[in-house]
């Protein structure tokens, strides 16, 4: 089949790769000049299925109220005049119950675990390189109450068969030796040994080259204007270079997905939740991380990517903004200086990206009421973690193959 994919981030490119592997004729269209220059460009770098948890969780409304008054808060809410923002926030609040949390987390872990397995298989098949490490991730707790409160998460990990280790200070230093100088800054940690790390931007660009070798065509610098409809199905894509036609269409435009499909009567409550990162060259190996360390107090991930340290995190609900406030940079600097001062922060690059978040934190993967239109978007903070699994799952659904995991509860129908 001829299939057109809209979007060349990590989700769009992985989808293209898996469709091409199944023998389809694939074209990818994007307004940018190459793969992954936006949200996939400088994320935290972790592939962490075990930490796949909804932002909408019991207790979050109270925590969010407290964070409003903290200088280095992990969540920043900047209200706009856009009614879409308010509707999304209300939908998110509706998911902050025990029952919804369990449903949403189960779905997220299902996709994330499958995706990690797909990534490992892809790596074996292609030999792709992207500063990858398979040395687990460590969630670090600065306060005793944080360590005492992980019982619910451990229960879910145990039920899902995810290996884990609860570590004291010495145990944390054993897996991340550079923490020896900061033992007074934390009380313990939760380690997931099967998690991985890697540079999402490098991966996406390398996979795009591999996909080209399978026949995928990339059309960069092309603006997508609208989807055209005829006879109850999609008949083409109106672009700045004319109308593009295919037999099947995939929308993988992240936070920009809702605007494109709204005219078709489809509701995808995906809202941009802004994240920040800095990337610094390592100048002191003895004070740099081995893998990824999650600073629970600030919700920041500190990751080793080759000869660089990537520090990323926070969640800012402020609409489609791309500014780089000094206050956000200060929070990233504070966390990494406290724990891993082995990077040259003066030489660091500062970045922000718009994570496409659904109110239930679960991505939208699957078909629509239009037989030839599919969605792969809304992965929030876990786009890198879920990319390979999402791409392979959708490729199977489009091809009519039996999916490896349950997919009926991942589609847009849950909102329409």
From Swiss-Prot:
It is an enzyme of class 1 (oxidoreductase). GO terms for molecular function: D-amino-acid dehydrogenase activity. One of its GO terms (cellular component) is cytoplasm. FAD binds at residues 3-17. It comes from the Bacteria. Its cofactor is FAD. Keywords: FAD, Flavoprotein, Oxidoreductase. It catalyses: a D-alpha-amino acid + A + H2O = a 2-oxocarboxylate + AH2 + NH4(+). Its EC number is 1.4.99.-. GO terms for biological process: D-alanine catabolic process. Belongs to the DadA oxidoreductase family. PANTHER family: D-AMINO ACID DEHYDROGENASE (PTHR13847:SF280), SARCOSINE DEHYDROGENASE-RELATED (PTHR13847). Oxidative deamination of D-amino acids. This is D-amino acid dehydrogenase. It comes from Brucella suis biovar 1 (strain 1330).
